[in-house]
Swiss-Prot record:
Species this protein is from: Mus musculus
Cross-referenced PANTHER family: IG(IMMUNOGLOBULIN) AND LRR(LEUCINE RICH REPEAT) DOMAINS, LEUCINE-RICH REPEAT NEURONAL 3A
Coiled-coil stretches noted in the UniProt entry, renumbered to this chain: none
Protein name per UniProt: Leucine-rich repeat neuronal protein 3
Gene encoding the protein: Lrrn3
Cytoplasmic domain ranges by topology: 648-707
Membrane topology type: Single-pass type I membrane protein
Amino acid sequence: MKDTPLQVHVLLGLAITTLVQAIDKKVDCPQLCTCEIRPWFTPRSIYMEASTVDCNDLGLLNFPARLPADTQILLLQTNNIARIEHSTDFPVNLTGLDLSQNNLSSVTNINVQKMSQLLSVYLEENKLTELPEKCLYGLSNLQELYVNHNLLSTISPGAFIGLHNLLRLHLNSNRLQMINSQWFDALPNLEILMLGDNPIIRIKDMNFQPLVKLRSLVIAGINLTEIPDDALAGLENLESISFYDNRLSKVPQVALQKAVNLKFLDLNKNPINRIRRGDFSNMLHLKELGINNMPELVSIDSLAVDNLPDLRKIEATNNPRLSYIHPNAFFRLPKLESLMLNTNALSALYHGTIESLPNLKEISIHSNPIRCDCVIRWINMNKTNIRFMEPDSLFCVDPPEFQGQNVRQVHFRDMMEICLPLIAPESFPSDLDVEADSYVSLHCRATAEPQPEIYWITPSGKKLLPNTMREKFYVHSEGTLEIRGITPKEGGLYTCIATNLVGADLKSIMIKVGGSVPQDNNGSLNIKIRDIRANSVLVSWKASSKILKSSVKWTAFVKTEDSHAAQSARIPFDVKVYNLTHLKPSTEYKICIDIPTVYQKSRKQCVNVTTKSLEHDGKEYGKNHTVFVACVGGLLGIIGVMCLFSCVSQEGSSEGEHSYAVNHCHKPALAFSELYPPLINLWESSKEKRATLEVKATAIGVPTNMS
């Protein structure tokens, strides 16, 4: 019982002490500020409840003169503080200091010697212009430093000496023009570096080599045009890198290979024009790839993304010119689950592209100008369990009979199994003006089944085949034409032709060099009738102009009383012979060739032709048949004599010269319909396939007694 009063006195004493401390703490809290316990995460993402003094947005001109002794987090954001007096006493346990959005012009105005326990310092959106030598030397425990959105143009080589525990450094949105690797010598533990939105002229080899523990690097928005091959050398722990919003025209393939443990790659918003073979290959740990918002991206070529065994997601969206993805573009990606291809210029996506992705779970191709034909018919054949994202936004824009319909609602049987090539309008512009001696690259891509072959025609009429180099020209296998050191002589109209067994498509571009193209003062067009039959006319033409447009239009008119039946076909630019078939016997035709020039003028020539009667054609056939039999008999006789001579003769060399007989055969008609008459080319090699161009025939006055 005697102990009871003692216990009461002890409890009363503790209560009084606590009350006094609370009163003292309340008294120490700066006027208008809020002092309370708040949740906080350390730079290592460790949760704690910290004693916080919140003086944000109070218009303070000076640092608070007095703070609670146990203050851990001090928030002074959005004030007008210009300096911190050296006589200021800082709480000994201060771990977080936020001075962002103030008027600090120099780090030397901050007495850091008394803040040795600081873990995080926020100085963004001040007026700092430089970081001098050892300016933060006293902050040996600092783990986060935010100096972004200032006016920094100079950082001394030893500015970060003493910050050997720093984990995150934000230098983005300043005025830095170069990166000095000496900055990083004092930062052996740095894991995150932000350097974006600085007018950095270039990155050098080994720029980041001292940062052996760096995991994330952001170099966004600094107008980089190239990345040196060894720029990322030494960063063996780098997992994430962002080149967002730069001016890269191609993937920095060699440099990326040096980041052997890279997991996340952001190349968004760069003017890369195509993803080439091997651009993303053998990156064994890459999980996500971003190639969005690329204004110049036209195609993803064969084996562009290859052997990425851990890749889970590809994002290639909002690319206004991306019109072609090769069937083998994505290869050896066993874990890819998500393929985002929406809001591009894709008219189709090959089934082979999807078949090569065994683990694909979702795909997004909505908001593309889908052509509902043979290439896309696999979508509705119920051969896939892949989830289509936003299927209600997936519409056909072509052909006209399906325009506006949802792709998933068009039955696959309504789409042909084979179809004409289609060169995407976005592949390359219709005209281009370049300076002399510059480099020109034109990307021509087409979709079709069977897959089309692509070649180019120069203004002088030369045919440039894939994988061939000719003078200043080189055509890649995918269809890209390169012209090195172009001069006014090479100016003019270039035409890409895509052709398969079904037909062809073509697209032209006018290239001006120094604002002009070669003049054509003596261009002419001549038509010659080479053969006339009862049901056909074989015609040839010759154009001397160097810069004729490739889409020649041929029209054949037949005068009838009540008929205007037109035939049409497509003829290649470099074919100058055509057999107009399905004509009526004993009928007068007017055959015209109209060739527009690059100056929006046209050269047109017409000839009148009357087809032979059936009786006359029969006599011709009999006469020709007799001559043919006689020729064959004579030929057989000659062959017999030669064989006899060969048997009698005992001499001969097995190494003698071989002779070859060339047989020029007429090609069979393309039997799509009567609107596509057979094409005859007497000089074409059987291994070369030609594009075709539209030809029209209009019948007008067939005699009434003709059937």
